[in-house]
């Protein structure tokens, strides 16, 4: 039986190839027919169709290849066809009977000829246990036969077989290993073959799931499979001889893991949150809950269905919401959502696989919390019909009245926040209403000054609204409008000048006492009987005065346009007007006097200093004129030289270049270097003209080849004369003398320090300072000593050269003084050690001076000592005569010890 099946598998591809060749041959002979080659196109789909999913391709035969065809679907809301004939889903929907069949139209653009074809959609069949068993009964897979050269003719080799997949259910209980199929080659009759499989699950991770008997070719599975981990295994079977040579081409073996319902649905979130506006109509979308199942989504094991288990609270209806059992969309099914009554609903949602079968399906639950959001279904209402307030005149940013409202909507939301609008009583826009964000009150504020003399009272009409419009069907009640009565309080206002500033035109040069104008102010308080007095506030040049009663302005000095206080021909003066109200108020006004120019300033030469060479060439001096007046009292100017002194015109000449410039040149061939003052007559063009003799200071200097003054001349020209140079030298000499005197003083001071003696005068008793050696406790008894003697002990002179009058006060010994070797001088006489050595030397030479031997007891250890005479003690090395003559060098204090060991009489 297995061999017959193998033969059929071998013949089937051959028959299919022959059939295809015959069809192609017949097609070439048959005539081409324009239109759809099929009457009905079929497609097998899963239950759910997704948006944009390609379904099938309808073929249209276009014989001449030049016709342009447009496709159209009979169900354009669900299906569309592109220009290549590919049919796509327009939207996502579950496949049902109403979508099972539709038409596709093809219309030619030129002739408008139209064709149609039917499309039939069917559901993909679900695998059952019987089909799984049937697929599992495949017992033997035979390697396809290979053809080769035979009888000298080259025959076509047949293609490899396509082995049908092996379907194996997951979670099988065994026993293991469980045999699946037997793989063999029909060449096993003549050869001893060995079989093996490769691929993931065999020799690749995860390894060891599938094994094969190398002798019999029996393929087995070693443990249960999990489709959620690996849904398909792709193995390759091999057949080799005992030498390892390949006998057959490898074949592909596909093992499909059949899904079992072993996974519960799992919600993406355990708690879902959604919102719905209050007052929503039935059918309003709320939210979508989603659960996933790890099982095959194309099988019943992964097809989920949703339902609502419970709703809390159950008012106003226990079924306020429903859920789409396939998509999980939650919508409203009843009216009556009111946030002011119920603000939140809690739903328990269940998801069940096996298309919701309560008997075989697995279930899981989640919680959906639906919050009822507020809409503007409650308008704001004023707490009173009329509000009152008052404001002083001319005040801005003042709160006049506080408007209060009530609103039942959710606080601090656009449906609760109030917006106030003035609908009447304020045509000029002097008031505004701002909303307090915390209390929702309306604050009536003055934004423009109010004049009591113009308006004494305002009656405003105010309307209250929300930031968002009211819900449909809700109207504003009369309580949403109120009246605000505002009373204006009269206050004393500032007097004001009109016009301000006031501009007048006057010629400069007016004499003192001239009345210029009257500058008066007005009092806006018409209902107050008040007097105004005037004072001068600012008069930079002190030219004016004002009458305190009538405001007449009179000059007290000559007006000068050229004054630095005049800017752009205008002089500014400020005056103050004050009333006698309570409290008194004042206002300022500015008087601007535009001064007309008169010819009161004579021109001056510019520049006032210049330099030129001793010879006329190559330099000339260009000059101009400076006139503080303006046209026509300024240029053009006339330049000339005076007749006196005669040397001016003899040495110089002036040439007028234009109305503003002239040129001064040397008239003689050589002029000695020096400073010359050249008078120049300059006349302006005023009426009458004004002349002036202006002095030009000219420096004549020696010039180089470029016509520039040399450095010596520039130094002279800079004003550094002989006197200045002498003064500088004297300062330098004095400074050097001071430095020299300081150096001499420092040298003398050092010599005085060196001349000081370490031992002071006889009348000063210093024995405590230099002869007390054994003091170890307490501080110094004598603090009165010269510290410099310790710092500079090198100034102490030897005894042989002590000056007369300085001697020791110690008592001289009664016997002759011994002679001691003179110690070498210290290498550093400035050290304090030299000071101590000198004192020690003096003490050694005078043994009778204190401290005395009877007082310097260093080895007293207390009475009652058991030790005998120290002369009886011998050292460890006293084995013979030793030389103790060196004790004589230790001084008179060790004389007795030297006599004891040296053999003296004592």
UniProtKB/Swiss-Prot annotation:
It is found in: Cell membrane; Cell membrane, Sarcolemma; Cell junction; Cell surface. It comes from the Eukaryota. Residues 26-159 form a propeptide. One of its GO terms (molecular function) is beta-catenin binding. The keyword Secreted does not apply. Ca(2+) 2 binds at residues 170, 228, 259-260, 262, 295. GO terms for biological process: adherens junction organization; calcium-dependent cell-cell adhesion via plasma membrane cell adhesion molecules; cell migration; cell morphogenesis; cell-cell adhesion; cell-cell adhesion mediated by cadherin; cell-cell junction assembly; glial cell differentiation. The chain crosses the membrane at residues 725-745. The keyword NADP does not apply. Residues 160-724 are extracellular. Cleaved by MMP24. Ectodomain cleavage leads to the generation of a soluble 90 kDa N-terminal soluble fragment and a 45 kDa membrane-bound C-terminal fragment 1 (CTF1), which is further cleaved by gamma-secretase into a 35 kDa. Cleavage in neural stem cells by MMP24 affects CDH2-mediated anchorage of neural stem cells to ependymocytes in the adult subependymal zone, leading to modulate neural stem cell quiescence. May be phosphorylated by OBSCN. Three calcium ions are usually bound at the interface of each cadherin domain and rigidify the connections, imparting a strong curvature to the full-length ectodomain. Calcium-binding sites are occupied sequentially in the order of site 3, then site 2 and site 1. Homodimer (via extracellular region). Can also form heterodimers with other cadherins (via extracellular region). Dimerization occurs in trans, i.e. with a cadherin chain from another cell. Interacts with CDCP1. Interacts with PCDH8; this complex may also include TAOK2. The interaction with PCDH8 may lead to internalization through TAOK2/p38 MAPK pathway. Identified in a complex containing FGFR4, NCAM1, CDH2, PLCG1, FRS2, SRC, SHC1, GAP43 and CTTN. May interact with OBSCN (via protein kinase domain 2). Interacts with FBXO45. This is Cadherin-2. It comes from Pongo abelii. The gene is CDH2.
């Amino acid at each position: 039986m297995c061999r017959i099946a193998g033969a059929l598998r071998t013949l089937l591809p051959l028959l299919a190839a022959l059939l295809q060749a015959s069809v192609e041959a017949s097609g070439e002979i048959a005539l081409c027919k324009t239109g759809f080659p099929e009457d009905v196109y079929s497609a097998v789909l899963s239950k759910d169709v997704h948006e944009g999913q390609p379904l099938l391709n309808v073929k249209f035969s276009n014989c001449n290849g030049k016709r342009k065809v447009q496709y159209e679907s009979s169900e354009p809301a669900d299906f569309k066809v592109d220009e290549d004939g590919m049919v796509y889903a327009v939207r996502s929907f579950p496949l049902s009977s109403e979508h099972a069949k539709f038409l596709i139209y093809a219309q030619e653009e030129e002739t408008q000829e139209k064709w149609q074809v039917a499309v039939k959609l069917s559901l993909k069949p679900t695998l059952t246990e019987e089909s799984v068993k049937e697929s599992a009964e495949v017992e033997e897979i035979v390697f396809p036969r290979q053809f080769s050269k035979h009888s000298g003719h080259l025959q076509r080799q047949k293609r490899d077989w396509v082995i049908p997949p092996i379907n194996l259910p997951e979670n099988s209980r065994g026993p293991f290993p469980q045999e699946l199929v037997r793989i063999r080659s029909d060449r096993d009759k003549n050869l001893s073959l060995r079989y093996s499989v490769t691929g993931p699950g065999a020799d690749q991770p995860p390894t060891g799931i599938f094994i094969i008997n190398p002798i019999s070719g029996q393929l087995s599975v070693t443990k249960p499979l999990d489709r959620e981990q690996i849904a398909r295994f792709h193995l390759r079977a091999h057949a080799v001889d005992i030498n390892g040579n390949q006998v057959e081409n490898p074949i592909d073996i596909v093992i499909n893991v059949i899904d079992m319902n072993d996974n519960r649905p799992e919600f993406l979130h355990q708690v879902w949150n959604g919102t719905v506006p209050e007052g929503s109509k039935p059918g309003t979308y709320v939210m979508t809950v989603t659960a996933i199942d790890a099982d095959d989504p194309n099988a019943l094991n992964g097809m989920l269905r949703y339902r609502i288990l419970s709703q809390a609270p159950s008012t106003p209806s226990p079924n306020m919401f429903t859920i789409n059992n396939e998509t999980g969309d939650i919508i409203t099914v009843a009216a009556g959502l009111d946030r002011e009554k119920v603000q939140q609903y809690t739903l328990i949602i269940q998801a069940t696989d096996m298309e919701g079968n309560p008997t075989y399906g697995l279930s899981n639950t989640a919680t959906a919390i639906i919050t009822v959001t507020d809409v503007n279904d409650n308008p704001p209402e004023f707490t009173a019909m009329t509000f009152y307030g008052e404001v002083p005149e001319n005040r801005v940013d003042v709160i006049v009245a506080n408007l209060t409202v009530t609103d039942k909507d959710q606080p601090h939301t656009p449906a609760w926040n109030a917006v106030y609008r003035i609908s009447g009583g304020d045509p000029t826009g002097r008031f505004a209403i701002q909303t307090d964000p915390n209390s929702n009150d309306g604050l009536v504020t003055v934004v423009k000054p109010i004049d009591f003399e113009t308006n004494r009272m305002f009656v405003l009409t105010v309307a209250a609204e929300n930031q968002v419009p009211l819900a449909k069907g809700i109207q504003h009640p009369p309580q949403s409008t109120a009246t605000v009565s505002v009373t204006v309080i009269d206050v004393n206002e500032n007097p004001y000048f009109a016009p301000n500033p006031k501009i007048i035109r006057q010629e400069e040069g007016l004499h003192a006492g001239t009345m210029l104008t009257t500058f008066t102010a007005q009092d806006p308080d018409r209902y107050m009987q008040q007097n105004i007095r005037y004072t001068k506030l600012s008069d930079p040049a002190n030219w004016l005065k004002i009458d305190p009663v009538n405001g007449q302005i009179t000059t007290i000095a000559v007006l000068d346009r050229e004054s630095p206080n005049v800017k752009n021909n205008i002089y500014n003066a400020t005056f103050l007007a004050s009333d006698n109200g309570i409290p008194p108020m004042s206002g300022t006004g500015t008087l601007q006097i535009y001064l007309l120019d008169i010819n009161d300033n004579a021109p001056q030469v510019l520049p006032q200093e210049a330099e030129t060479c001793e010879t006329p060439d190559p330099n000339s001096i260009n000059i101009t004129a400076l006139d503080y007046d303006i046209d026509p009292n300024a240029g053009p100017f006339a330049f000339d030289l005076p007749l006196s002194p005669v040397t001016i015109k003899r040495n110089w000449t002036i040439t007028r270049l234009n109305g503003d410039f002239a040129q001064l040149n040397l008239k003689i061939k050589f002029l000695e270097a020096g400073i010359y003052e050249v008078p120049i007559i300059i006349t302006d063009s005023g009426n009458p003209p004004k002349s002036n003799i202006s002095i030009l200071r000219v420096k004549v200097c020696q010039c180089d080849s470029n016509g520039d003054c040399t450095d010596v001349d520039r130094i002279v020209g800079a004003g550094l004369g002989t006197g200045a140079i002498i003064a500088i030298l004297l300062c330098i000499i004095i400074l050097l003398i001071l430095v020299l005197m300081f150096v001499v003083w420092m040298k003398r001071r050092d010599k005085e320090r060196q001349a000081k003696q370490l031992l002071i005068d006889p009348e000063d008793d210093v024995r405590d300072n230099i002869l007390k050696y054994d003091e170890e406790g307490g501080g110094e008894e004598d603090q009165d000593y010269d510290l410099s003697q310790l710092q500079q002990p090198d100034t102490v002179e030897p005894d042989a050269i002590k000056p007369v009058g300085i001697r020791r006060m110690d008592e001289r010994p009664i016997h002759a003084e011994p002679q001691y070797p003179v110690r070498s001088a210290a290498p550093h006489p400035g050290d304090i050690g030299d000071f101590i050595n000198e004192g020690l030397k003096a003490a050694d030479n005078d043994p009778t001076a204190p401290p005395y031997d009877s007082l310097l007891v260093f080895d007293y250890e207390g009475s009652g000592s058991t030790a005998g005479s120290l002369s009886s003690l011998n050292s460890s090395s006293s084995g013979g005569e030793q030389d103790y003559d060196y004790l004589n060098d230790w001084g008179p204090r060790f004389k007795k010890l030297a006599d004891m060991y040296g053999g003296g009489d004592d």
